[in-house]
């Protein structure tokens, strides 16, 4: 299954808030989000819906998400927590969480177009797994600085997660550590995602 490129609000109405996909919100009047939240979701539907939340928030194909689930399953510890850590430490997500891009698709575009440096080297792979002590900067071009500077000004001024440090005047971000689960911005029951894939096996 390919990466979704259709209307983003359509997904938000069905799955509710996905900050990585879009910062837009459906109109409050007759908002299907409010209607669907009061409707009891069957156990049959809830697992695939949680899986879809993860897919659309992080902008993954079905094959990519399955690959991450398998990697998490082979690691020691909670498969669900490790899965979220793997996704949060992707370069495109790190750029989004730093505020250098307003969405994860926007961050992916910055990476693909070679605007991003990791430890002073151009990295054009959005799935690159960041690690503690990585330094994220941008190429020294006027266009890159203007674009990312605008994103930094427009990004929501939420508290920066403790695994990251941003030096906005230098267009630089630091990865301090692996993310702690309490700083994951997506409201998700990751265990249901793991259960979904275990039932598919």
UniProtKB/Swiss-Prot annotation:
Pfam families: Ribosomal_S4, S4. Residues 31-41 have a biased composition (Polar residues). Belongs to the universal ribosomal protein uS4 family. This is Small ribosomal subunit protein uS4c. It is found in: Plastid, Chloroplast. One of the primary rRNA binding proteins, it binds directly to 16S rRNA where it nucleates assembly of the body of the 30S subunit. With S5 and S12 plays an important role in translational accuracy. It comes from Cycas taitungensis. SUPFAM superfamilies: Alpha-L RNA-binding motif.
């Amino acid at each position: 299954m390919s990466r979704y490129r259709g209307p983003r609000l359509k997904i938000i109405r069905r799955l509710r808030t996905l900050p990585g996909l879009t910062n837009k919100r459906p109109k409050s009047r007759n908002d299907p989000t409010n209607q669907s939240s009061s409707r009891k979701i069957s156990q049959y539907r809830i697992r695939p819906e949680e899986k879809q939340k993860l897919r659309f928030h992080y902008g993954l194909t079905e094959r990519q998400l399955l690959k991450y689930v398998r990697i998490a399953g082979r690691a020691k510890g909670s498969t669900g927590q490790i899965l979220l850590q793997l996704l949060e430490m992707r370069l495109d997500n790190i750029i989004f969480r730093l505020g250098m891009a307003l969405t994860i698709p926007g961050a992916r575009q910055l990476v693909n177009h070679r605007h991003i440096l990791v430890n002073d080297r151009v990295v054009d792979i959005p799935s690159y797994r960041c690690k503690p002590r990585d330094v994220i900067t941008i190429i020294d071009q006027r266009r890159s600085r203007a674009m990312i500077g605008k994103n930094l000004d427009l990004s929501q001024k939420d508290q920066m997660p403790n695994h990251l440090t941003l030096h906005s005047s230098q267009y630089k971000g630091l990865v301090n550590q692996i993310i702690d689960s309490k700083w994951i911005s997506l409201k998700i029951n990751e265990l249901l995602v793991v259960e979904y894939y275990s039932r598919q096996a």
